[in-house]
């Protein structure tokens, strides 16, 4: 395919147009008075959202060069979302600011490499300064505040706070759609382990790329399943029940995996295969945990059991299992309460006798998975559109809360970024490195400027007053008042803020150091078929 190439200023200008189109669409959602964006969907009603990464992923531009710029900013939002689960709009605003300030200087003759070096140095200093002013998050009330700020709902903050209290900060919390109008919290027994499906063709929800199995059987073995004949009798028995099957094995390969996938695609029966969690003796112990939780038996040579001889009585059962590409969650296993209690007691006794910190950590993980549970926040709303929007907000809030527990919090509303300006400005740099530092200094103001603008205030006035205010004091855009941000509950997780800044600086630097852009030329339209010889155009109605 032929390529279209742009160089230097032309290349950067085209990419920046794409950056602006995406950033201008996303940044209107920033802050407590941020607006919504309506996204057209191929099927069903439009999606109304203020979630930055959701908006960014939907944007596709016609011009190839502009689209590359937009996609790079979308990557900033996605990466920030992957790391911290929130802060995607802030990351987008920071990227646009660094790109614009940087482009002015590059166009004026500054060296892009020197600017990049200065940006990286200034960003690293800002991140260290953010960590230095972070405050740890502990207690139900503090956790509720973080969640409430992210979701813009005190009620959601209470749900997430209660869920984390009941299943632990690292417990499994899922978000589902409720059949009613009200949002509610349920905590159900369950277990999660870090192994996902072996083939993406096993998913039942192509949009979320997850496999949801209702009332499934569970085959648990430490063996490798390569020959489909080994489990064929068992598969035939499961097929008669018309219930799905989860296979947890050392591996599923050879002819077995494609055979299972083919039957899933054809709709013969629903099956998902995952690798067994852990390694060595720990794997055997975890498989036994799963078997006890689900009322099944581990098919292992240690017990003299073979796959080909396995019967339905060896299979575990559960009310529901959810499998994505990275993890499996088993909810309401059918194991007996007595057997589970005995297993928990055994693990506790091992905890008391072990002298290894590593073993203690792994035993505590197993104990939490057996004795803990899965918290389910069931989201209710009057309409499907409102339901989707609420789910996205709760997901953001949950991620932000976990990030806050992990690395602490700082004053929200962009206040912390203004606070660290003094540390960055103190950097003694020269030449283009100093120019890079100054670009970051200007970009650090941009989130506050945009939050104020979205709330109907003049950003420059707010920034000037903020720079001269006592530490911790900031502008509450929701009320127009100057308050102690942390005491008022306007807070941001450090992990979210630093990830947004680091990812924005990284991608913006790449755009500034771009000297050539190569894109596919659009395919020419196919010519219309030739008219047969001797045919009068008037025969076509004169058109």
From Swiss-Prot:
Compartment list: Cytoplasm
Enzyme Commission numbers on file: 5.6.1.7
Keyword Cytoplasm among record annotations: yes
Transmembrane residue ranges: none
MF GO annotations: ATP binding; ATP-dependent protein folding chaperone; isomerase activity; unfolded protein binding
Annotated Gene Ontology cellular component terms: cytoplasm
Stored HAMAP family: CH60
Domain of life: Bacteria
Classification lineage: Bacteria, Bacillati, Bacillota, Bacilli, Lactobacillales
Name by which UniProt lists this protein: Chaperonin GroEL
One of the protein's GO biological processes: protein refolding
One Pfam family linked to the record: Cpn60_TCP1
Family, similarity comment: Belongs to the chaperonin (HSP60) family.
Keyword annotations from UniProtKB, A to Z: ATP-binding, Chaperone, Cytoplasm, Isomerase, Nucleotide-binding, Stress response
Class of this enzyme: isomerase
Keyword Ubl conjugation (UniProt): no
Naturally occurring in which organism (per UniProt): Streptococcus pyogenes serotype M49 (strain NZ131)
Role this protein plays: Together with its co-chaperonin GroES, plays an essential role in assisting protein folding. The GroEL-GroES system forms a nano-cage that allows encapsulation of the non-native substrate proteins and provides a physical environment optimized to promote and accelerate protein folding.
UniProt-annotated binding residues for ATP: 29-32, 86-90, 413, 476-478, 492
InterPro entries membership: Chaperonin_Cpn60_CS, Cpn60/GroEL, Cpn60/GroEL/TCP-1, GroEL-like_apical_dom_sf, GROEL-like_equatorial_sf, TCP-1-like_intermed_sf
CDD domains: GroEL
PANTHER family: 60 KDA HEAT SHOCK PROTEIN, MITOCHONDRIAL (PTHR45633)
Reactions the enzyme catalyzes: ATP + H2O + a folded polypeptide = ADP + phosphate + an unfolded polypeptide
Subunit architecture: Forms a cylinder of 14 subunits composed of two heptameric rings stacked back-to-back. Interacts with the co-chaperonin GroES.
């Amino acid at each position: 395919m032929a390529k279209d190439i742009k160089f230097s200023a032309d290349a950067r200008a085209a990419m920046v147009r794409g950056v602006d189109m995406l950033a201008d669409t996303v940044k209107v959602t920033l802050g407590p008075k941020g607006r919504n964006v309506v996204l057209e969907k191929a099927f069903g009603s439009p999606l109304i959202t203020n979630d930055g990464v959701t908006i960014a992923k939907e944007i596709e531009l016609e011009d190839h060069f502009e689209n590359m710029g937009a996609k790079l900013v979308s990557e900033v939002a996605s990466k920030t979302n992957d790391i911290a689960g929130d802060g995607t709009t802030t990351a987008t605003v920071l990227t646009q600011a660094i790109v614009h300030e940087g482009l002015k200087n590059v166009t004026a003759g500054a060296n892009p490499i020197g600017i990049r070096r200065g940006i990286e140095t200034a960003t690293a200093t800002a991140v260290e300064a953010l960590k230095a002013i972070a405050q740890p998050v502990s207690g139900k009330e503090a956790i509720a505040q973080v969640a409430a700020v992210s979701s813009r709902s005190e009620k959601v903050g209470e749900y997430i706070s209660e869920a984390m209290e009941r299943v632990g900060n690292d417990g499994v919390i899922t978000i589902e759609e409720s059949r009613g109008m009200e949002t509610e919290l349920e905590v159900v027994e369950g277990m999660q382990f870090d192994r996902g499906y072996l083939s993406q063709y096993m998913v039942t929800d192509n949009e979320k790329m997850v496999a949801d199995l209702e009332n499934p059987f569970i085959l648990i073995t430490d063996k490798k399943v390569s020959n489909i004949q080994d489990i064929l009798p068992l598969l035939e028995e499961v097929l008669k029940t018309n219930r799905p099957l989860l296979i947890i094995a050392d591996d599923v390969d050879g002819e077995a995996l494609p055979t299972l996938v083919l039957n899933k695609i054809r709709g013969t029966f629903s099956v998902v295969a995952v690798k067994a969690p852990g390694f060595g003796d720990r794997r055997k112990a975890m498989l036994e945990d799963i078997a006890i939780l689900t009322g099944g038996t581990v098919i292992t040579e240690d017990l003299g059991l073979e796959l080909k001889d396995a019967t339905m009585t060896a299979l575990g059962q559960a009310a529901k299992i959810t499998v994505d590409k990275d993890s499996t969650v088993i909810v309401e296993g059918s194991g007996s309460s007595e057997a589970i209690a005995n297993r928990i007691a055994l693990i506790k006794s091992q905890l008391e006798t072990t002298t290894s910190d590593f073993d203690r950590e792994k035993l505590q993980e197993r104990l939490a998975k057996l004795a803990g549970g899965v918290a389910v926040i069931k989201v209710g709303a009057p309409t499907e559109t409102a339901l989707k929007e609420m789910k996205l907000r709760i997901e953001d809030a949950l991620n932000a809360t976990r990030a806050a527990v992990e690395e602490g919090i700082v004053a929200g509303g962009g206040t912390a970024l203004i606070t660290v300006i003094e540390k960055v400005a103190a950097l003694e740099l020269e030449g283009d490195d100093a120019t890079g530092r100054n670009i970051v200094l200007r970009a650090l103001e941009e989130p506050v400027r945009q939050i104020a603008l979205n709330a109907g205030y003049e950003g420059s006035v707010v920034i000037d007053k903020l720079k001269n205010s006592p530490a911790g004091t900031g502008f509450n855009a929701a009320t127009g008042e100057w308050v102690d941000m942390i005491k008022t509950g306007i807070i941001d997780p450090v992990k979210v803020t630093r990830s947004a800044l680091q990812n924005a600086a990284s991608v913006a630097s790449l755009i500034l150091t771009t000297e050539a852009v190569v894109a596919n030329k659009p395919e020419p339209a196919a010519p219309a078929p030739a008219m047969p010889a001797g045919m009068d155009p008037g025969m076509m109605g004169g058109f």
